[in-house]
UniProtKB/Swiss-Prot annotation:
Belongs to the N-acetylmuramoyl-L-alanine amidase 2 family. Zn(2+) binds at residues 18, 123, 131. This is Endolysin. It is found in: Host cytoplasm.
Length: 151
């Protein structure tokens, strides 16, 4: 089967952080999320990177391709998804592991170097959602992981 060819991004001005909206007990990765997205009619996983519970960073959609993760921003952004983000009742919860948060920080530092001037954003900054279930700015600046239900 031929690999799908996606349009390349012409610019990268945002780096969006998402969560998979899964419970802490679910350790899913790019394979499962790709399947979920395909079941919604998408051609591939919408995120460029997935960070598993153990901190493993998995490549999703080609990094230079237009993603499918934030309506209105896909053509100018990279999408990073942390596995987790909801509690047993389905409410937002910053239940990410220390390994995930360390991997996220390292990846974001790399991406900020690669895409000079790109702004770090949470999905809830531009959509009425809780995603990624924590205050990204506070975590980035103060290293404090606090649940947030913006949206």
């Amino acid at each position: 089967m031929a690999k799908v060819q996606f349009t390349k991004r012409q610019e990268t001005s945002q780096i969006f952080v998402h969560c998979s909206a899964t419970k802490a007990t679910m350790d899913v990765g790019v394979r499962e999320i790709r399947q979920w997205h395909k079941e919604q009619g998408w051609l591939d996983v919408g995120y460029h990177f997935i960070i598993r519970r153990d901190g493993t960073v998995e490549a999703g959609r080609d990094q230079d391709a237009v993603g499918s993760h934030v309506k209105g921003y896909n053509s100018t952004s990279v999408g990073v998804c942390l596995v987790g983000g909801i509690d047993a009742k389905g409410n937002p919860e910053a239940n990410f592991t220390p390994a995930q948060m360390q991997a996220l920080r390292s990846l974001l530092v790399e991406l900020k170097v690669q895409y000079t001037g790109a702004v770090l954003m949470a999905h809830h900054d531009v959509a009425p959602k809780a995603c990624p279930s924590f205050d990204l700015k506070r975590w980035w600046e103060k290293n404090e992981l606090v649940t947030s239900d913006h949206g």
